[in-house]
């Protein structure tokens, strides 16, 4: 029982918390620092901002902050190459040659042909 408690204590002491963020490739991501005096561990440059926030360019990358209390916050950014459909404005294109238009045009043409033929007779 003491061994299990000891292993649980070691596990809690070396705790890692994972944070996942999805973003559009090349945009700037605004994240909150987990602790004010943490140590940054990563190869992507980040820009510290006010209120314990930082900005990072979105690429598929992983970095971490090691807090003084021993907790390590691991961030995983997953970059998408296309923007979400929410921001894409799609306009409906009305084609001139839709089936309904062709049917109506054919009926009008046939009617005109018969009426002009009767007037000439």
From Swiss-Prot:
GO BP terms: symbiont-mediated perturbation of host cell cycle G0/G1 transition checkpoint; symbiont-mediated perturbation of host cell cycle progression; symbiont-mediated suppression of host antigen processing and presentation of peptide antigen via MHC class I; symbiont-mediated suppression of host innate immune response; symbiont-mediated-mediated suppression of host tetherin activity
Protein origin, superkingdom: Viruses
Resulting phenotype, residue 85 to A: No effect on ubiquitination
Post-translational modifications reported in the UniProt record: Poly-ubiquitinated by host with K63-linked polyubiquitin chains.
Keywords annotated in UniProt: Disulfide bond, G0/G1 host cell cycle checkpoint dysregulation by virus, Host cytoplasm, Host endoplasmic reticulum, Host Golgi apparatus, Host membrane, Host-virus interaction, Inhibition of host adaptive immune response by virus, Inhibition of host innate immune response by virus, Inhibition of host MHC class I molecule presentation by virus, Inhibition of host tetherin by virus, Isopeptide bond, Membrane, Modulation of host cell cycle by virus, Signal, Transmembrane, Transmembrane helix, Ubl conjugation, Viral immunoevasion, Virion
Principal subcellular localisation of the protein: host cell
Membrane topology, as annotated: Single-pass membrane protein; Single-pass type I membrane protein
The UniProt record lists the keyword Nucleotide-binding: no
Regions that span the bilayer: 96-116
UniProt key word Glycosyltransferase: no
Effect on the protein of changing residue 82 to A: In strain: Delta/B.1.617.2 and Kappa/B.1.617.1
InterPro entries reported in the protein's UniProt record: ORF7a_SARS-CoV-2-like, ORF7a_SARS-CoV-like, ORF7a_SARS-CoV-like_X4e, ORF7a_sf_CoV
Motif ER-retrieval motif boundaries: 117-119
One Pfam family in the UniProt entry: bCoV_NS7A
Gene3D superfamilies for this protein: SARS coronavirus X4
Residue ranges of the region described as Ig-like fold: 16-80
Free-text note on domains in this protein's UniProt record: The di-lysine motif confers endoplasmic reticulum localization for type I membrane proteins.
Role according to the record: Plays a role as antagonist of host tetherin (BST2), disrupting its antiviral effect. Acts by binding to BST2 and sequestering it to perinuclear region, thereby preventing its antiviral function at cell membrane. May specifically downregulate MHC-I allele HLA-A*02:01 (HLA-A2).
Name this protein carries in UniProt: ORF7a protein
Organism of derivation: Severe acute respiratory syndrome coronavirus 2
Lineage, opening ranks: Viruses, Riboviria, Orthornavirae, Pisuviricota, Pisoniviricetes
